[in-house]
Amino acid sequence: MGKLKLIVMVALVATISCEKNAEEPFEDTDSMTYVAEVYVTWNSESPAWPDKDAHFSWMGGATHNANVKFWEIGTLASPGIDLMSITGLTTDLILEIQAEVDNGNAENIISRRHWFCPRGLFHRLCREPIFEFEVTKEFPLVSMVSMLGPSPDWFIGTESLSMVDNNGRFIPAMTYELYPYDAGIVSDNGVNDCCDREPLSIPQQNVHLITPETGETIGPGILGRIVFTAKPE
């Protein structure tokens, strides 16, 4: 009986130990690799579905500190955001980011030159929706954007999303929901099909979230999500 009791106690201790280790955060470090997986839920069942080839376009962005913002609601879009939101190309945005890398405000550039597509869309420009990037404690914020294609000047993205918690530790996993934004470049009044580009807005409008009140023909609501998962060394 004594031997049996000892075996049971050893097994119980082992079980508690395993559960504790599973709940403990990984060892704190100064840098962390994250896996980002993009899920596109914008599809033919969405309101005002524009086109059978609708997708998220190139993804561009960076890790950075709080001294810089590459886009922000309520402010005018930069030329790089302009080009991205209208054409899907992130080339000018990457140049803006590189300038902030040189200024010491950004660190790692995120650039994926392919489409992120909803399930069921088979197109030669669609690629794997998973990529990795590195974040450091010195540059813990992540901003990345992608045009809603086709659209006048609409996009999705993250803006200064922190990958560290209030205690300064890297967040193990996070799901970020993607809402549509209007870059304020093209005068889209919600009457025409979303793929038609009317004259440029003069004056240029501020970047804003697309809501039922803003009058665009897309959304509103969540069009996808990005799942971030830490990948400890």
Feature-to-residue mapping (PLM):
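Positively charged n-region of N-terminal signal peptides that target proteins for export
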Residues: 1-5, 19
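Sec-dependent N-terminal signal peptides
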Residues: 5-14
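Bacterial Sec-dependent N-terminal signal peptides
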Residues: 15-32
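Structured domain cores in non-transmembrane regions
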Residues: 27-33, 42-156, 160
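Mature, soluble, non-transmembrane domains
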Residues: 103, 107-233
